[in-house]
Amino acid sequence: MKQTLQLIKYLFPFIILAAFFCLYKKEYSFMKRFCWRMTMTFSARKLFIIVVLSSLIFMNWCCYMTDPNWAVAFAAFMTCCLLFNRVADHVLHRLHERKRFWALTLMLALVCYSIPYMNSIFHVLYMLGVASVFYPSEKVLRMKDDTDSIDNPLGLLQKILKNYF
């Protein structure tokens, strides 16, 4: 069991990276619906946060079962702070809008990945960095309230897709 959890722990970032490159800025109908729902409904954004947090909780559990240490406790604390929807929403918006914070988060994640006992902190920072790319910015969320676009939903969808990433 321990070997399986270690395999999951080390393959997880590569699976997320492959999914990221397969979906980022693609014109699939799935991505159009995803961007539309993430922009238009709060419940879709909340579901997205729940999926990200459940994967983080699973990865924290995998890290705890394979090699428990203080870094796992700190990663679990960071994940618990993100359980508040307002905090997670704020963090994902800031990382999406401010590219320096996003780059700093991913650089810090790489540093944590290179240190063996800080692998659990890497998972938290890495997931936040990848998830923030697919989270809508404040600019896109303001577009949905534009009175000119309400009459033309297809035009609004094209505008959202153009400015989403």
Question: At which residue positions do the language-model features occur?
Answer:
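N-terminal signal-anchor/start-transfer transmembrane helix
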Residues: 6-31
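Short, highly charged, low-complexity non-transmembrane loops/tails of multi-pass membrane proteins
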Residues: 140-165
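Hydrophobic, membrane-inserted alpha-helices
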Residues: 50-60, 79-82, 102-114
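Hydrophobic alpha-helical transmembrane segments and immediately flanking/interface helices
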Residues: 69-93, 136-146
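Alpha-helical membrane-associated segments of multi-pass integral membrane proteins
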Residues: 9, 13, 97-149
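Membrane-helix boundary elements
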Residues: 32-69
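Membrane-helix interface and helix-disruption motif detector
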Residues: 1-9, 57-75, 91-96, 111-127
